[in-house]
Swiss-Prot record:
Induction: Expressed in the late phase of the viral replicative cycle.
HAMAP family: ADV_PRO
Coiled-coil regions listed: none
Similarity-based family: Belongs to the peptidase C5 family.
Superkingdom to which the source organism belongs: Viruses
Name the record gives this protein: Protease
Chief localisation class: virion
Subcellular location: Virion; Host nucleus
Record bears the keyword Transit peptide: no
InterPro entries: Papain-like_cys_pep_sf, Peptidase_C5
Length: 196
């Protein structure tokens, strides 16, 4: 089932991302259009009319750093193959409008932190946005994201990876319990919606 746009918005605000947060978007997200300030968003790989499929998070750190976080760590090619979603167009729009030399530097994770049987992708995106809001120059390498253990994509279904994913999800829930009053209030419901 996963998390709704409204649930994610409440959690992101609790995590202190409000000043940078552009909102929850579907696959038609226009990219980062303001070149002067940090910005971040959660984007679904499908259009809003479908009800959504998979959440990813993005961050912009001037003058030219574009961060993409996918809880599965998929490449653009894999996202296109599985979800019919491409982020190259977002990169191009952001480069043209936001970067002084019309170039952006893409940073993305390439390891999975989420089980393929989990629906917690939106919650993982919230955790990443907390990292971005606090460490915009290095949102993948900081005390927030260092709590999660990455697994190579080709091991996504491997039995030995499942215990790592289970621990990651418990770490995620603990992080959100500690940092989000909304999550604490609706924790049982959110766990039921996202547990594998």
């Amino acid at each position: 089932m996963g998390t709704s746009e409204e649930e994610l918005k409440h959690i992101v605000i609790d995590l202190g991302c409000g000043p940078f947060f552009l909102g929850i978007n579907d696959k038609h997200f226009p990219g980062f259009l303001n070149k002067q300030s940090n910005a971040c968003a959660i984007v679904n790989t499908a259009s809003r009319e479908t009800g959504g499929v998979h959440w990813i998070a993005m961050g912009w750190h001037p003058p030219s750093n574009f961060y993409l976080f996918d809880p599965f760590g998929f490449s653009d090619k894999k996202l296109l193959q599985i979800y019919q979603f491409e982020y190259n167009a977002l990169l191009k729009r952001s480069a043209i409008t936001s970067s002084p030399d019309r170039c952006v530097q893409l940073f993305q994770n390439n390891e999975s932190v989420q089980s393929p049987h989990s629906a917690a992708c939106g919650l993982y995106c919230c955790m990443f946005l907390h990292a971005f809001a606090n460490w915009p120059a290095h949102p993948f390498d900081n005390p927030t994201m260092d709590q999660l253990v990455g697994v190579p994509n080709n091991m996504l279904e491997a039995p030995r990876a499942q215990s790592i994913f289970k621990q990651n999800q418990e770490t995620l829930y603990s992080f959100l319990h500690y940092n989000s009053s909304f999550f604490r209030r609706y924790e049982n419901k959110l766990r039921k919606q996202t547990d594998p």
